[in-house]
A protein has these predicted regions:
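Surface-exposed loop/turn motifs in large extracellular/passenger domains
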Residues: 9-11
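N-terminal first-folded block
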Residues: 1-7
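A cytosolic small-molecule/anion-sensing beta-strand core signal
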Residues: 14, 36
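Glycine-rich hexapeptide-repeat left-handed beta-helix
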Residues: 6, 20-21, 26-27, 31-34, ...
Length: 162
């Protein structure tokens, strides 16, 4: 992620995660805020906005100046949230420009919470186990893969439960 606190302030709170290739920035005198348990997906751009507690901004979405993403709301991947838009709590917004599609279900909110928790666990595990290594010259045969509780995209989870 590129966290540009050079002009405006960045405020990323406890339990929040900002994933690979995100950009956070703000104009001078403004700030970008990601509240507790906020989840910012890969490639998202936040510029001078506020992401409230437990909200999720999907991959490659853009949230522009003075927009507010409500508590436990979800911005779909690739959405464009215009300046000054107020996204209501517990809603799904999508599109270019983003518009409110519907309220989120309890199942969807539980899925989001599980995803955020998995990123917190990744941080703990990384601090505990990362060490300097020498790059491999060839793939290791039968290399062990990471073992995590089943964490699936929501669509795959729903299909499995159907």
């Amino acid at each position: 992620a590129c966290l540009r606190g050079d002009f405006g302030r960045l405020d990323i709170r406890a339990g929040a995660n900002v994933q690979d290739t995100c950009i956070l920035h703000a104009y001078p005198g403004n700030e970008t805020v990601v509240e507790e348990e906020g989840h910012i997906g890969h490639g998202a751009i936040l510029h001078g906005c506020t992401v409230k507690r437990n909200a999720l901004v999907g991959m490659n979405a853009v949230v522009n100046d003075n927009a507010v993403i409500g508590e436990s709301a979800v911005v779909a991947a690739l959405a464009f949230v215009k300046s000054d838009m107020i996204v209501p709590p517990r809603t799904l917004v999508a599109g270019i420009p983003a518009r409110v599609l519907r309220l989120l279900t309890d199942e969807e909110l539980a899925w989001k919470a599980e995803g955020t928790a998995s990123y917190r666990e990744l941080t703990r595990r990384s601090f505990a186990t990362l060490r300097a290594t020498t790059p491999l010259v060839a793939p290791e045969r039968d290399r062990r893969r990471i073992e995590l509780p089943e964490l699936l995209p929501l669509s795959a989870r729903k299909a499995r439960l159907a």
